[in-house]
Amino acid sequence: LRHLLDTRQPDGGWRCEKYFFGRGPETDYSNPLPTLAALDAFRFTPLVNAEPALDRAVDFLLAHWVLRKPIGPCHYGIGTLFMQVEYPMRGYNLFMYLYVLSFYSRARKDERFLEALHALQSRLREGQIVVERVVPKLAGLSFCKKGEKSEPATERYREILKNLEADE
C-alpha cells in the first residue's frame, strides 16, 4: 500500500508508462483506469475515507468527468464507449467509475459524481441495469447479455445506492 501511495502523480492519480499514442500535453496527466483500479484496491483497506492522498485521486477522477477529453499515456476519455454500461465491469466506463467512487465519501458528496449517477440512472430499464457492452469471451453467459437486464449488475447498482445512504 505504501508503494502505491508513494507512486502517485502530482495530479493525484496513477499512471502506466506506455505511450501507445505518442507523447503530447494530454500524456502529462495520470491514467484514469489505473487510478480507478488503485482506488478499487484501497476501498478494502482502513485507508478508505481516511487517507488524504486518496482524496486527491478521487478529485482527479471527478475532474475527468468535466474534462472528458482523452488523457494520460493511454488516452482514456469520457465519450461513447465510457458511457456504455459494461458488465462484468473491467474497463474504464461509467458503471465501474460510479461503483468504485461510491465507496469514497468525498465522491458521494460531489455534484460531478451525482451528475454521473444521473447519467447511469437514465439508462436503467424498470430500475435495472441493462448491459450495453459485454466482455466478448463472456457473451454467452446469461447474466451479461447485451441489451438485456442483468440481476448481478443491478445488485452492483444497488450497492452504489446503499453507499450513498452512508452520508445521510
Language model features: what each stretch is:
Residues 121-126, 133-134:
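Catalytic-face loop-and-helix region of soluble metabolic enzyme cores
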Residues 2, 6-56, 60-115, 130-167:
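An alpha-helical repeat/solenoid feature that recognizes helix-turn-helix modules
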